[in-house]
Amino acid sequence: MKDKKFFIPDGIEYYMPKEAISFETLRHKILKIFKKYKYNYVIPPIFDNLENLLTLKGNDLQNETIKINNYSNDGTIGVRVDITPQLSRIDYQSFLEHKPNRYCYMGDILRINAEGFDRKNPYQVGAEYFGQLTKKVDVEIIKLLVDIITLSKSKKILIELGDLSFINLFLQNLNINSKTRSILLDFINLKSNHEIKEC
């Protein structure tokens, strides 16, 4: 008699019928948003040559990537832990066109350690802009992000901007003197919401 128990590896997520339909519906809504902002959809493979997966510096990618010997050419292939490096390689192929490129992607990734995620096989969604960065591009990518996050119907959205140049440019465009601008920047760094409102 066959064992009817169904086991899946720890940290790996399955989508059952109802969840799969909801998931696909959400995926199509996200694709429509990408199309609205003229981002071109690409689907890189989950297995790729190691050099395509490790184009970004950092031990995280190196340590988390599952490596497999490719006996057909004595090379090494890996299972991606992040799709972003593959986008860099895709953009490199069209570098000679000398024009800004917008790419978007969605796909499974696999991590040895689930730290920072709710599973070992999270589904990654992202957009990459390759070209000269401007204030317009910064605003565009933030609006795109907000449109996608809004699909979650969360009542509160918090966006942390790691690059202070955006905040500095924003504050420079406000009609305030340099002293107030400096105080406001300090409050922003301290995340002092009450003081920011009072300012």
Mark where each language-model region is.
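Extended, charged alpha-beta segments that form solvent-exposed binding/catalytic grooves
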Residues: 1-199
